[in-house]
Every structure is written in structure tokens, then in C-alpha cells.
Amino acid sequence: MDFETLLSYEWGVMMPEFIILGVAVALSLIDLFMPENRNRQLLGLFAFVGIAVSFVSLLSLWTSDVTSILGDTFRLDSFAKSFKALLLIGSALVLLLSIHYEPKERIAYRGEFYYLFLTALLGAMMMASSGDLITLFVGLELLSISSYILVAIRKKHTLANEAALKYVITGSIATAITLFGMSYIFGFTGSTNIKEIAVQLASTSDENHQYVLSLAFLLTFVGLSFKLASAPFHMWAPDVYQGATTPVVSFLSVVSKTAGFVIVLRVIVSVFAQTPAGSSASMLMTFAPYIAFLSGATMIIGNTIALRQRNVKRMLAYSSVAHAGYVLVAFASLSMFMFEAIWFYLLAYVFMTIGAFAILQVVSQHPDDEDISIFAGLYRRSPLMAIAMTIFLLSLAGIPGTAGFIGKMNIFLGAFVVEPAHYVLASIMVITTIISYVYYFGIFVQMFFRPVEHTHRLEWPPGVIAVVVICVIGTVLLGVFPNIAYDFLAPFQHFSDFLQ
């Protein structure tokens, strides 16, 4: 590839990624030359500004046509734009939490947190725009390796070390399984380009090849299910959530999970949606019942085990497992509005989950003090924050008037509009949602109907207050006026360019 060819590419489509990369490199150099006793909070603010500028650059590309560069290894389509917006919004909110987290632990600011955070975000954004299995895998590893280190960033903390070890082991196994599945796809087609793979597989008719492709589908989907923390591949989540810091848990719960669904949609839908699997059904349609079974099991296991949890982080970990099941309902239904339903639900999930973790971060005065009883009497100590937490819990539970309700309703209706309708899956969704009321309202009871155990005044840093306010506004606004979000997607025409 000569210099003139490089100059001919439209590098502007990668501007959001270039900004994140540049800020991450700059932060690493600044941190290297800063005195050890200097406060690293400014690095966090610099990282936040970088994410904001990257988001603005993404908005400037919002109405641009589909563009691919570097041999179609990087493509900017409606799917990439919409999901990168989710990743940037979630990352910006988590970063505000992290800036005000470390002083509470009375440890020095560690600058590496911020550029590792940005590196993980960069990997997730690359996954959203990947048009090639190699680019997709590089993005996945950028996200995964950075996440492993972020979980273990408290090197002398026993629970953090245990969580990081479990995360590395399960994550490595998941990566190996995913790569094994992708190797079958490459071996069959001789290409790593997703578009070329889809074209070749669409013309496959030999029944002997169906077994190989079915194995590739199962291996790839099982490996990626670890990233989603869907049952039965969720066992790492509770321990990792309990051992990691609250900002890192927020990142894993929101940004990393969103990236997981991004790669599932990019690989599974792009490659297997048009691959024949006997009769007139595609391979994706053939495996839809298995995905539906996995979705139902994830909703049941996540919500029922959460009932037994006293540790709030472990409770929210199992809640996160259940929410992965809800999103998988949309994936199993394969309705024409699948992308919009998944995108809206993940947007609602960003606001209600990060908001809940923001309040937990302040209420939990000690890193290991995360029992549900820490919320006792919160309404008397901080009425506004108790009301805000109630809004987040209501949204997580799917109560009308909140963004969570609209997200669940869209997915629920999507399960009915397809042929054949997924009545059983929709019923499981309703029943498990009702079950979730028990453990969500357990926190509600602690806040409003239990006596105050701690009388000391809660300190609410400006960054945390900003996160809570933004999340409350987002949760309520999307619950009352959901068309605001859908109007945001109007230029994309139901993601019609996804398979082009």
C-alpha cells in the first residue's frame, strides 16, 4: 500500500476513534512525567473532554452515507453510528464517577486507570465499525485486556485480585472458543471480510457443509455469550462485580455489555442471516429457538438468584444477567424492529444502571461495605437521592412511566409480531419481570421504611450529582417521550444499510 493510496482514504470517518486514541496516548505521556504526589484528577477531566469531543465528531458524521475504508475492514454505517453513541454516552458518565471515586478510598490517583479506560472504549468502538473478523477480534481484545487490568487495578485488594483472576480465566476461555468458531468460518470461505463471507455462505447448498457452519455458529455464539454474561455463562459476573471498584463495575455492566451485543449483531446477524440451513430457513432462523431457550434461562436464573443476594453489587450483577436475557428476547424474535428495540433498551439501561451505581458509590462509605442495609433510612439522610434511586429501581423493574418500561414493552411486542409468535418467551419475560420487583423493592423498603443506621452526613461530589441528574432526566424523559430517542434514529431508516 503506497502513500498515495493511504491519502485517498476518507480518514475523517475514523475521527471519533482517532480522538480517543490521541487522548489515551497523551494521558499516558503526561502521567509518565507527572510527579507521583500530583493529583491525577485533571487526567480524568482531560479524558472526559476527549470523550465529549469524540461524541461531537460522531454527530458531525451522523447523516453521512455508508463509508468503508482500508479494504472494508472499517465501515461507518447506521449501526456503527448509533451504537458508538451509546458507548460514548455510557463511558462519559462512568468517567465522571471515576474522577470522584479514588479520594474516598484515600489512595493516590492512578493515571493508568484513565488511559486503560479509553483503550477499552477504543476497542468497543472498533467493534462497532468492524467490517472484518480480524478488526473485530482486535477490538475485542483491546476491550478485554484493558478490562482485566481495570478490575485488578487495586493490586493489594484481595477481592479485586480474586475477581481479576476469575475474569481473566473465563475471558480467555471465551476468547478461545470465539476464535475457534471464527476459524471455521475463515476455513470454509477463505476470507475474513464479513461482507464476502456473507455472500459466499448465502450460496452454500451442500448439506455436509451445514454441520461445519452449525458448529461455527454455536462456537462463536457460546464464546460471545460469556461477554454478555448470559446463563449459563454468567458465573464470573457476581464475583467480578463484587471485587471491582464501582466505576469499573459500571463500565462492565453498561459499556462492555453493549459492546458484547455489538459484536453478536455484527458477526451472527451479518454472517448467518442469509446462510441457508435446509428448507427455506436461514441458519439464524434455525437456531432462533436455541437462542430463545438461552434467553429464557438467562431471565429465570438472573432474577431468581438475585432474590437471595444481600450484597448490592452481587444483586445488580444478577440483575445485569437478567437484563441480558431481556435483550436476547429481541435477538431471538428477529423482528424487523430488532435493532431499534435493542438500541433503545441499551440506552435506557445506560441511564438507569449508571445512576444506580452512582448512588451506591456514595452510600457505600467503605469499598467492602455493600450490604443492602447501607440504604437504610436514606430518605431521611438524603431525600432527593432516595427519590432518584427509586426512579432508577422503578426503571430497572420496568414500571410504566420510565425508560425501562418502554424498552421492555418494545421487546415484548416484538416477540408477538413475528411468525410464529414467541408466546412462551414473552410469558417468561413478564413473570421474571414481576419476580424482579421483590429484590428491587427490597432496596426501596430499606430507604423509606427502615431506621437510619448511620447518622454521618453523606458527601455528594459534583461529578456524582451531575451523573445522577443526567440519568434521572434520561430515565424519565425516555419513559414519557420515547420518540425523542427514535427521532435520533430517523435518518437510519430501520438500519437498512446493515447488510449492504
UniProtKB/Swiss-Prot annotation:
One of its GO terms (biological process) is ATP synthesis coupled electron transport. It catalyses: a quinone + NADH + 5 H(+)(in) = a quinol + NAD(+) + 4 H(+)(out). The chain crosses the membrane at residues 13-33, 42-62, 79-99, 111-131, 133-153, 168-188, 211-231, 245-265, 281-301, 321-341, 342-362, 386-406, 424-444, 461-481. GO terms for cellular component: plasma membrane. Pfam families: Proton_antipo_M. Keywords: Cell membrane, Membrane, NAD, Quinone, Translocase, Transmembrane, Transmembrane helix, Transport. It is found in: Cell membrane. The keyword Transmembrane applies. Its EC number is 7.1.1.-. It is a multi-pass membrane protein. One of its GO terms (molecular function) is quinone binding. Disulfide bonds: none annotated. NDH-1 shuttles electrons from NADH, via FMN and iron-sulfur (Fe-S) centers, to quinones in the respiratory chain. The immediate electron acceptor for the enzyme in this species is believed to be a menaquinone. Couples the redox reaction to proton translocation (for every two electrons transferred, four hydrogen ions are translocated across the cytoplasmic membrane), and thus conserves the redox energy in a proton gradient. Belongs to the complex I subunit 2 family. NDH-1 is composed of 14 different subunits. Subunits NuoA, H, J, K, L, M, N constitute the membrane sector of the complex. This is NADH-quinone oxidoreductase subunit N. It comes from Anoxybacillus flavithermus (strain DSM 21510 / WK1).
